[in-house]
């Protein structure tokens, strides 16, 4: 779809990055799935860059939705890590994930974290999710995602 849009533009229009970004988006690297992938692989530098972009664009990427997605990701990781001996169909029933390639990605990532680390991360996510929903009296909610990445990195 994006390639079709770009192909309809004149050659002089394509010469600026701004127009390509306008039709294609800032970057395919800046989405929740890439953030999850980078966190799963413990690539905190790239996760921090994505989080910084999300924080700077919090209307487009509300922290409440980001933290909910991260919670689901790490909860699925916990369930899969806890049940590595189960078959594909058993894990699918447990997690509600029926795409084998996604489950395989989770299995690969599961070696990067211990169960204790995952439980700790889930607790940290809940804390920052609460802050993003205004449950604490901190008004600096745009930086919560960056604080979260810094905290799980240590």
Task: Specify the residue positions occupied by each region the protein language model found.
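Amphipathic alpha-helical interaction/assembly segments
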Residues: 2, 9, 54-83, 117-154
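Small-residue-rich helix-loop
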Residues: 12-117
């Amino acid at each position: 779809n994006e390639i079709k849009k770009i192909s309809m533009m004149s050659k002089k229009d394509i010469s600026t990055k701004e127009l390509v970004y306008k039709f294609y988006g800032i970057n395919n690297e800046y989405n929740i799935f890439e953030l999850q992938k980078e966190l799963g692989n413990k690539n905190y530098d790239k996760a921090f860059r994505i989080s910084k972009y999300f924080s700077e664009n919090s209307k487009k990427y509300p922290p409440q939705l980001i933290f909910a997605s991260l919670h689901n990701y790490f909860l699925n990781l916990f369930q899969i890590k806890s049940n590595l001996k189960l078959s594909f169909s058993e894990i699918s029933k447990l997690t509600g994930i029926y795409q084998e390639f996604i489950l395989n990605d989770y299995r690969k990532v599961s070696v990067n974290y211990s169960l204790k680390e995952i439980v700790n991360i889930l607790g940290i996510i809940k804390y920052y999710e609460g802050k993003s929903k205004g449950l604490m009296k901190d008004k600096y909610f745009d930086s919560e995602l960056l604080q979260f990445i810094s905290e799980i990195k240590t």
